[in-house]
Amino acid sequence: MSVSNLSWLKKKSQSVDITAPGFNPLGGAGKQAPQASKPPAPKTPIIEEEQNNSANTQKHPSRKSELKRFYTIDTGQKKTLDKKDGRRMSFQKPKGTIEYTVESRDSLNSIALKFDTTPNELVQLNKLFSRAVVTGQVLYVPDPEYVSSVESSPSLSPVSPLSPTSSEAEFDKTTTPDVAHPKEAPPASTVSGIRPARVVSSTSEEEEAFTEKFLKINCKYITIGKGTVSGVLLVTPNNIMFDPHKTDPLVQENGCEEYGIMCPMEEVMSAAMYKEILDSKIKESLPIELDQLSGRGSCHSKKATGVSAEDADPRARDQGNDSASTAPRSTEESLSEDAFTESELSPIREELLSSEPRQEKSSDASSESVQTVSQMEVQSLTATSEAANVPDRTSSNPGALSHETGLSGLETATKGGDKATESLQEVSGPKEQSTEVKGQDNQDSSHQESSLQQEAGEDSVSSGETVELKEKPAVLKDQQGQELKRDSETEVEELRKLWKTHSMQQAKQQRDTIQQVSQRESKHSSAAADAHGEGSSLLKEKRRHRLHKFLCLRVGKPMRKTFVSQASATMQQYAQRDKKHEYWFAVPQERTDHLYAFFIQWSPEIYAEDSGEYTREPGFIVVKKMDESEANEAPAGEAAAREWEVVSVAEYHRRIDALNTEELRTLCRRLQITTREDINSKQVAPAKADLEPESFRPNLSDPSELLLPDQIEKLTKHLPPRTIGYPWTLVYGTGKHGTSLKTLYRTMTGLDTPVLMVIKDSDGQVFGALASEPFKVSDGFYGTGETFVFTFCPEFEVFKWTGDNMFFIKGDMDSLAFGGGGGEFALWLDGDLYHGRSHSCKTFGNHTLSKKEDFFIQDIEIWAFE
């Protein structure tokens, strides 16, 4: 009975399979009829398994067409190998990436560092479930040469339909190779109701914009006294971190420990963007390229501003010439920027993009330059006289400078490398004709300049038509102008014929001759250029602001150094607790808006208070955002240099409270109202003044032979708080215990207080050190940040711990040292306590404590506080 029930259940399951969407009645009819006619018979498990496998293989080809759309939907059946391959093949290669094969020593962090990205970005690109990678694994990494274009990204369209991907097309080929007539596509209504295949890729720029939760900016970290280093500023919602580039010269010299910093976002009190740095200390650390970004042509900037087109354009003739590349490039940049920013000729750049006008202008310019060279070779004396006449004509006609400067900017944007010789020919042409017409020198030059200005106007109007030199001749009013017009047309035809016959050797001679002429002209034009020095400085300032802005971060606690141990970083933070916590970065101008937008997303909502909704605690509040209209009216100073500033909520309330308190005090003074604070301050101030000298006079067990009373008072003000109130006990003195370092160590036994060492050398100078622990023999350095060194030579100075290292005290049997770093000690004594040495060191940032680096010890006193 059990066997009959089993066969009945199998028939039932087969009848259900007939209605399955992938069932093929033609393929299954031949098999189902014999099974129905046979009587039920007992079957072994092996036979049942073979029949189930054969049934699955019969149904598989008919269902391949449906797998294309349904392979991501769980049907409750066992997934086949083809289905897994289809899922794997649907992973598209993201745009802007290349394939990278993991090597044996690679990790996800090392791969991210190699391709200038982050491990999180690699995880998102490759849809990884962990950060573990294996050798031979293929990963998609960002292509450094990829340039994203908004026009070519189809994902930017929000209404674009889902189109079949290349992986789906390959899936069709691999899964249905033997089907001659595939199943017809269902109607559109059916397709819309079916869930499309999942495409595992994130190449959309919109999606990247939403998933990118950090800023990665290449900038420069400006330190105080330690130079400026290049690196990467990483700004995340939780931290701000700067990693220096290992290839930077200062990093290679001083190490990464000096420049790698990080702080939590909660510690940031203020972030402000400045056009320039006004602090003199920070300004001294600026490199030349940041302080004067236009300094590449500083020696030529004055000349470039005042020189006319015939002077500047020949120097900008050949940009590929290495021997004279600095001056021409800087001159060309200054002239082109002046022409297009001040004369507003920028539309010409877009109008002259067609190749035909540019080629014809280049050929005309080159042909004219060839004739210029031939004329210079035949009549060198005439060329010299013409070069001498250039400044005369410039000074005689003040309007010529502006016209020619605008023309040079126009030629810079349109004619490329051949523009210089054409302008030289245009200058020399009228001068040769002026020798024939002796009495009308200035008139001809003014006519020629007006014609050049008219030609520039015609260029700005016509954008697509072919422009030739003969189609825009000089238009002159008198008969002489008509003759010049006909002569210019004739010269153009002759010049075109001459151009075909000249070789590269003549072009080289032409460049040499032009450089000689430009050198002569630059000497004569230096006087005219000095008058425009003020305009040149303004151009430098404008260009500097155009390239870099300065980000100032003010934090509540010092930033922690990232390339040192946790203990060292904590101690360095403690050492810098009393300093001004301000950090400056030179940021590219195009990233300043990104920083502002990044901080803005934590600012409170504008209408949160009106609507009564307060969703989250705000992070930053905008206190200053300068508009263009305000920038012109802003007064000089720090407020004018600051473009925007965002502050934390705590800092905002602190400023408001300080402002209200100051306004309240001002109002009380104006109304002559005496507050309780004023009364208390007047009563307490005299008492403090009387008690202050007494409070800093400690009791000494023995009179000091090295320190005066006023020196003791000065030292007491800088002692650690745990020593205040304790008497000074003399535990060691050379006059009492002798000059031996071993004896000094024996007298320190059993002490548990800071000790003060005072030294007097043979020159009569007094200096010393305060040790946080008694002196002892040690294997390495010991002590805490309470240790400092001091000197009274020539005036009293105290050098406390800088936080750079933890080399405080080192005791050996034959020496005793304070401070270290770079192989130098702040103070070093030998085993006989007779010879000593002092040098500047990083631990305390001190200078030489004595008059001379090497000194002889006359007397020593060591005081304990107990």
UniProtKB/Swiss-Prot annotation:
Composition skew (Polar residues), residue ranges: 364-399, 448-465, 502-519
Query: From what organism does this protein derive?
Result: Mus musculus (Mouse)
At the top level, the lineage of the source is Eukaryota
The terms under GO molecular function for this entry are: oxidoreductase activity
Q: Which positions fall inside the TLDc domain? A: 705-866
Q: What keywords tag this UniProt record? A: Mitochondrion, Nucleus, Phosphoprotein
Annotated LysM domain ranges read 98-141
Q: Where is this region: Disordered?
A: 1-92, 150-202, 293-540, 682-703
Q: What is this protein called?
A: Oxidation resistance protein 1
Q: Which residue ranges have biased composition labelled Basic and acidic residues?
A: 63-88, 170-184, 347-363, 433-447, 483-497
